[in-house]
Amino acid sequence: MEFITQNQAITSLSMINTDIDQPKASLRSRFLLHLIICLLFFVPPCSSQAWDGVVITQADYQGLQAVKQELIDPRGFLRSWNGSGFSACSGGWAGIKCAQGQVIVIQLPWKSLGGRISEKIGQLQALRKLSLHDNNLGGSIPMSLGLIPNLRGVQLFNNRLTGSIPASLGVSHFLQTLDLSNNLLSEIIPPNLADSSKLLRLNLSFNSLSGQIPVSLSRSSSLQFLALDHNNLSGPILDTWGSKSLNLRVLSLDHNSLSGPFPFSLCNLTQLQDFSFSHNRIRGTLPSELSKLTKLRKMDISGNSVSGHIPETLGNISSLIHLDLSQNKLTGEIPISISDLESLNFFNVSYNNLSGPVPTLLSQKFNSSSFVGNSLLCGYSVSTPCPTLPSPSPEKERKPSHRNLSTKDIILIASGALLIVMLILVCVLCCLLRKKANETKAKGGEAGPGAVAAKTEKGGEAEAGGETGGKLVHFDGPMAFTADDLLCATAEIMGKSTYGTVYKATLEDGSQVAVKRLREKITKSQKEFENEINVLGRIRHPNLLALRAYYLGPKGEKLVVFDYMSRGSLATFLHARGPDVHINWPTRMSLIKGMARGLFYLHTHANIIHGNLTSSNVLLDENITAKISDYGLSRLMTAAAGSSVIATAGALGYRAPELSKLKKANTKTDVYSLGVIILELLTGKSPSEALNGVDLPQWVATAVKEEWTNEVFDLELLNDVNTMGDEILNTLKLALHCVDATPSTRPEAQQVMTQLGEIRPEETTATTSEPLIDVPEASASTSQ
């Protein structure tokens, strides 16, 4: 069929009309007239894309054919690019969108396309967006691409493009997004690349670019996101930030060969939220003016030669979540003001020259790996106690002291002595109680006030009476510990929540359990409590944290006992790990599947709605198996306490939008929370962080719509050889389905489980040959 352009079609109509006006018009001419009219006006589009009724121009048709000719299409996505091009603008050609007969969008990501991008793409003069990311494209970027006048977005990341970045791209005055990350590009960054006054996002990370950072990048008035990390850039970091670049929010320059002093002008970027200079050769000191960055969430300068003291003013940046100052030459003490940063969930000052005691709150919140490598630093672990005050020298001892003790000194000494005496009495009392309990057990069932084991109505084993006067009920066979053992165990606070306080209890034999002490004023009456908890105690599933026992004290106290999970919570595992700990895709998918299986069991077999599913309530065992915790605890609480839990979940970003009106959780609200956790695993971002004022699901949905896929996924996933593009993309689609604003359109947990099995069949979910690297043991946390 011969190619038909818009003008040719109109000319044909005019000629046929002339023929019809003649008295002897042939039947064939009339037939052709009706046929062309039907083709042009009455044939519906081939897809859901709206068609404006205009046929593609000849220049654009030829340009697309040239582009197709130089591409390798192993999966046949471009088979539709054939024939006359008549259907190119009506939705018949894959990945093509038009306006008035001209191509405005080419969108073909994740299609396994190879070959190269043709220089004739420059014929598409109306092109606004080119999205060919996550393919296998090689060759150089066409220079003609930068000469397209209305070009607004170029996404070519995750390919094999080589050569230099065309300087012509700096001529595109309407260019808003340029993402060429994760390719094989080399040579220098064109000095004029940021000349566009519309440029918002520039990502050139993970290439082999060399030379210095162009000054124009630090003076762009529109730029909000700049990523140049993982290249071979050298020279100093520019100290010209802030004169015009006041809108910059993200600045990533890590893993280069940049040198020179720390740029003080960085403090002028008052909108900055995230900056990373790690693994360069930066020296000098940190300015106290960093406190002007009031919106800063992440600061990473690890692996440099920065010296001097840590500024006390860093403690004024209340938004700070991630602070990494490790592997530098910092001296002095850690400012106590940093302890005031309530949002801080990652802190690392290891391998510096710091000295003095670690602030108590920091040593309790972060493990020893955050402080090691500082020989003069103390107080961050049992093995690094701070030295006591030195005893006076012999010369001073010979001098008589005539100083009288003040009243304050006498009170302090007396209080200390009294405290020591009380501690000794408590220890003696515990030993006596334990000894008496053991003697009672040795009598083999004699009547008396000792502990007596009895089967409960629900099949658990109860220890009633005893020296504690309380009641301990075990759900799994013989009692592993007595009430006295539990109450005398060494306890370490792990977290607090609406339900109560969680402790890690170390028993006398060295075994560990997690104990949650429920708040007394929010629990149901004892009879209702026992009825509900005896049901929960029978629930067993590989992906649910088992309730092992509970204790009812003589004064109304209620303790519930669970298995202790040494890996901690998923939230800690994902957001508070060290820089050398990587979580590969098979591990993340295994966690997602485990959560889905656990939630399915709760909904279908146990008939329980969780109501407060968060990554803090998903715990990990030694094998990094996901175990959902805190399920069913709402049944033990009053209605008012349940509402409080829902409100807390909403503040953390896991609450389904309809709960603001319903006030009662259901299976669809649980699936929404599961979807948020899946997004958390895919993006590496915490839902508790506000992302430009929107929650995590909204941010992801917007990014996907704008084709910013490279910014959605955790960078570790994009660089992981185990990652399958189709798998993470389909998992992202499923997660967005789970967090749909309309509850009726969300899947049930069973459907989620089924779809995950289709995305990654079970036989491929085992841990791959690339294991987790140096994953440290974390304290278990069930903060929610």
Swiss-Prot record:
Residues 431-784 are cytoplasmic. SUPFAM superfamilies: L domain-like (SSF52058), Protein kinase-like (PK-like) (SSF56112). Its EC number is 2.7.11.1. Keywords: ATP-binding, Cell membrane, Glycoprotein, Kinase, Leucine-rich repeat, Membrane, Nucleotide-binding, Phosphoprotein, Receptor, Repeat, Serine/threonine-protein kinase, Signal, Transferase, Transmembrane, Transmembrane helix. It is a single-pass type I membrane protein. LRR repeats lie at residues 126-148, 150-172, 174-197, 198-220, 222-242, 247-268, 271-294, 295-317, 319-342, 343-365. It holds the Pfam family LRR_1. Residues 49-409 are extracellular. The chain crosses the membrane at residues 410-430. Glycans are attached at N82, N203, N232, N268, N316, N348, N353, N367, N404. It catalyses: L-seryl-[protein] + ATP = O-phospho-L-seryl-[protein] + ADP + H(+); L-threonyl-[protein] + ATP = O-phospho-L-threonyl-[protein] + ADP + H(+). The protein kinase domain is predicted to be catalytically inactive. Lacks the conserved Asp active site at position 612, which is replaced by an Asn residue. However, according to Ref.9, the kinase activity is conserved. This is Probable leucine-rich repeat receptor-like protein kinase IMK3. It comes from Arabidopsis thaliana. The gene is IMK3.
